Design a protein with these regions (language model features):
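Short coil-to-beta-strand
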Residues: 1-6, 57, 61
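N-terminal glycine-rich phosphate-binding loop and ensuing alpha1 helix
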Residues: 2-49
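Conserved acidic residues
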Residues: 3-4, 44, 65, 100, ...
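Cofactor-binding loop segments of dinucleotide-utilizing enzymes, especially the Rossmann-like FAD-
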Residues: 8-10, 51, 107, 136
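Short clusters of hydrophobic/aromatic residues that line enzyme substrate/ligand-binding pockets
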Residues: 16, 21, 67, 74, ...
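Residues at the C-termini of beta-strands that transition into short coil/loop
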Residues: 25, 70-71, 135
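Conserved N-terminal catalytic core of the sugar/cofactor nucleotidyltransferase
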Residues: 33-98
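Conserved beta-loop-beta/alpha segment of the NTase-like Rossmann-fold superfamily
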Residues: 74-147
Length: 147
């Protein structure tokens, strides 16, 4: 079974410019997602989908592949996660490389770990599911989580 991790890292954040490569505990925030994916040893390839040369350089320095820069249509404020994922999968399909499983990881997820990725893969296999998505219960109105 061929598996790919696709880490989404658009360069055009409006609220926090360059958020995907901002330092978080002395590391670029994207590095946590890349290292978790690589160290999980689940994936044949760890890809970063970005439209930004700076993000590309950082991603490659942590061992991810960036085979192309994302198109402008899939990098604008209205582009969806699904559109960006399909762009990567279609790129590989055009190279006659098909993946059986694709995992979407966001670049600004510094608390992701290889063990969480492995656990989610085990849930996927064990339950004969076609997707796994992390959620968390919050006991109060979510607005109370904000300052």
């Amino acid at each position: 079974m061929k598996k790919v991790a696709i880490i989404l890292a658009r360069g055009g954040s409006k609220r926090i410019p360059n958020k995907n490569i901002k330092s978080f505990l002395d590391q670029p925030i994207i590095s946590y997602s890349i290292r978790a994916a690589i160290s999980s040893q689940l994936f044949d390839e760890v890809i970063v989908s970005t439209d930004c040369e700076k993000i590309k350089k950082v991603a490659e320095s942590y061992g991810a592949k960036v085979p192309f820069l994302r198109s402008s249509i899939n990098s604008n404020d209205h582009a969806t996660t699904v559109d960006a994922l399909f762009e990567v999968l279609n790129f590989y399909k055009s190279k006659n490389k098909i993946f059986d499983l694709a995992t979407c990881i966001y670049a600004c997820a510094p608390f992701i770990t290889s063990s969480l990725l492995i656990k989610s893969y085990e849930i996927l296999k064990t339950n004969n599911s076609d997707s796994v998505f992390p959620v968390m219960a919050y006991s109060h109105p979510i607005q109370r989580a904000l300052k």
